[in-house]
Swiss-Prot record:
Entry-linked SUPFAM superfamilies: Zn-binding ribosomal proteins (SSF57829)
Any Pfam family hit: Ribosomal_L33
Entry keyword annotation includes Disulfide bond: no
Species of provenance: Aromatoleum aromaticum (strain DSM 19018 / LMG 30748 / EbN1) (Azoarcus sp. (strain EbN1))
An annotated GO cellular component: cytosolic large ribosomal subunit
Protein name as it appears in the record: Large ribosomal subunit protein bL33
Keyword Ribosomal protein belongs to the record: yes
Length: 55
């Protein structure tokens, strides 16, 4: 059976709060790292979230 193209990733807050979101991405179509402005409930603001590999 073939291996799937989607990889699970973790989007971690750059505010240093330790908050993160998990999602998946297609590693063939988006080989670069993702960055999103998302809501961090710890600091109650929108901050930059960067992709790190999910262990």
């Amino acid at each position: 059976m073939a291996k799937g193209a989607r990889e699970k990733i973790k989007l971690e807050s750059t505010a240093g709060t330790g908050h993160f979101y998990t999602t998946s991405k297609n590693k063939r179509t988006t080989p670069n790292k993702l960055e999103f402005n998302k809501y961090d409930p710890v600091v109650r603001k929108h901050v930059l979230y960067k992709e790190i590999k999910l262990k």
